[in-house]
Amino acid sequence: CGASTSLGMLVGWRVIQGEETWRVVDGILTNTRTGGNLMTEARFGDFKLHAEFRYPPNGNSGIYLRGRYEVQIIDAPQAEPATDLIGAVYGFLEPSAIVTNGPDAWNSYDITLVGRMVTIVLNGQTVIANQAIPGITGGALDSDEGAPGPLLLQGDHGPVEFRNIVVTPAG
């Protein structure tokens, strides 16, 4: 078992909407079970995000961009692309392909968000290319689409792990 850090020691993040179930173990941000969502204290306008993630079989999570637009993380073996599957902006934009390394393997997102235009690269393949997000995802923190907002990692659907989360300004 590696070194563990309670979330209280993780600077720049806080749990909202539920129980604190997040831990940092050997540099991996881990949600151990169904619990709260994890939100950055920082707010972002136009940005590029790199994040690596790992989910268990039947896992379900997501990354809310600016706290408003959910990029889906879900176990979807042999699925056809849909707006509720991995690579999608939940409920709005369908990926061109399901490009997953599967459960229990590391996957990566490289996401660029400028205004409401989003590009999503999943495991090295562009699955959404500079498309407009038509509205906010259910569960969004607010509806002020012109304002900067936080990143939010979904923890209310069960276990998930993240590492190498890097946000840089777009442009």
Where are these regions (language model features)?
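Carbohydrate-interacting regions of secretory-pathway proteins
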Residues: 1-171
